[in-house]
């Protein structure tokens, strides 16, 4: 079984940040392969979109694309870890316990962290409506799944999930930005989380539908007590 670690940098500063983050994890997994994707690795459509919408280099529309590209180049049942460049290790040399567990547990396809921040506050009404949910849905009362880092086991289920995530972002770009929602937002709405909002509701709706894909759900307390932490580094200046 192979293990690959990937990230993305939109410019020289973010590429350097991502390379350091990826290398720090590779130091724990000496036989792992790594790749930091750059704009040159993206199709023209995504790069052109990013020129018009610089936030998140096109509102993070590239994220499922690069994960899919990386998964397609590894073998069935190999493991891939995606992490944002600002993620980092709490302590050098200490294991990432949830990741080690996921690697050993063949029954799970995707490992994802569910935060304490409620979906209702961080997903706009248009995305909620696109998932055929209303503002009273129980799914909005639970924590949003983070797109900051997650692990993938290559198989048809994880690839189908990626294809669906990417297709939604490409086909519904206008509702995955920061424009005012055409549908009513929840009264506790604070701000949209774009690719993450879609990622989160995809996971939740598939769990409710008892879809064949299996998620290893990582809760905030467990994540924040582990060694791989989100937003550990500042944005480059």
Please place each PLM-identified region on the residue numbering.
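Glycosyltransferase catalytic domains, chiefly GT-A lineage
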Residues: 1-237
